[in-house]
Amino acid sequence: MQSNIPRAAIHVGKDKKSFSAQVGNEAERRGWDENVYRLKNADKEKNNHYNFSRKNLNFEIVKDGKIVPLGSNPIPLHERIQMRLDELGFKPYMDARHPDQVSKNSPNCTVGMIFSGDHDVLYNLAFGNQRIDTANPDADHSHIVLQQGIYKWAKDTYDFVCRKWGEENIISFAVHCDETSIHAHVQTIPVEKVKKRGRIGSKYVNKNNPDIVLSTKEWRALPKEERDNYTKHTASKDYVERVSYAKVWGETRKAKSEYLSQLHTDYHNEVGRKYGLARGIPYNDLSPEERRDNT
C-alpha cells in the first residue's frame, strides 16, 4: 500500500449504552481552565498535547448549520443526549442487582465518531500560512486566527452527517483546534423510522369546504344524495421514530462492516474529495506513517 496518501479519516467509537457527564465535558471543554490543560498534558501515558492558548479557536456547529464557540449551549452534552432519548421514548434496561446502573444487555443508544484527515491538509485549512507547532502544548498561539477553510470543511461534514442520520439526531458537532491535529467529534443517536401498526383509515373531505372532514362512519350516516359532495382520501400510515443501533449500523458484524465501508465511500464522494483527501480506510489497514498522520 502506498504510504503518506492524504486521506480523510472516520473513527467510530465504542458502542455506548449510556453517556457520562465527564466524557461530555471533555468534548465541550466545559470547566477546562489553564490548570486543567496542564494536568491533562502531565499524563505522559496518554501523550496529550492540549494547548490552552488555542482553546478559543474551538467551535461547534448547531441547528441550521450555525457556527458558534465550543460550549455555547448552556445544557451539557450528556443532558442533551438524555433529552433526545426521552423524546424518542427510549428506556434502557437497568441492572437488577444495581438499579442505578444500566444493564450490560441494554441496547446501544448513542454513537460517537471523529471525523478528521491528513494533518497537513487540515492544518492548512485551519491556519493557512501561519506557521505554528501544534505539538507544543506550551506555545503561545493567542494571536492565531482561524481561517475560513476549516469552517467550510466542518460545515460540509456537518451537512453530511445531518443527511446521514438526521439533524435532530446530531446531538453534538464539536471541532477541536487545540490539539495536535484538527478533528470533529460527532455524537449521534441511532434512529430508525417504522410505520405505525394498525389499519389504514379513510377520510371524506367536502368538495366545497375542505375544512369539513368526516370519518367513514360519519360519511355513511349521510343521506345518499349528500355523499357525492365528499371526496374520499386514504390516509397513509404515519411513521414513528425509535432508537435502534442495530437497524442503523447493522445487525451482524458483516452488516456493520459493510455500513462502515459505505460510510467511508459516501464521505469521500460528498466531502473528502473536495479537499484533496483520498477515501478513508480502516485504521488497522493504515501504514504506520498514515496512522500517525490521521490521528
Question: Where are these predicted regions, by residue range?
Answer:
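N-terminal nicking endonuclease/strand-transfer module with a His-rich metal-binding environment
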Residues: 1-295
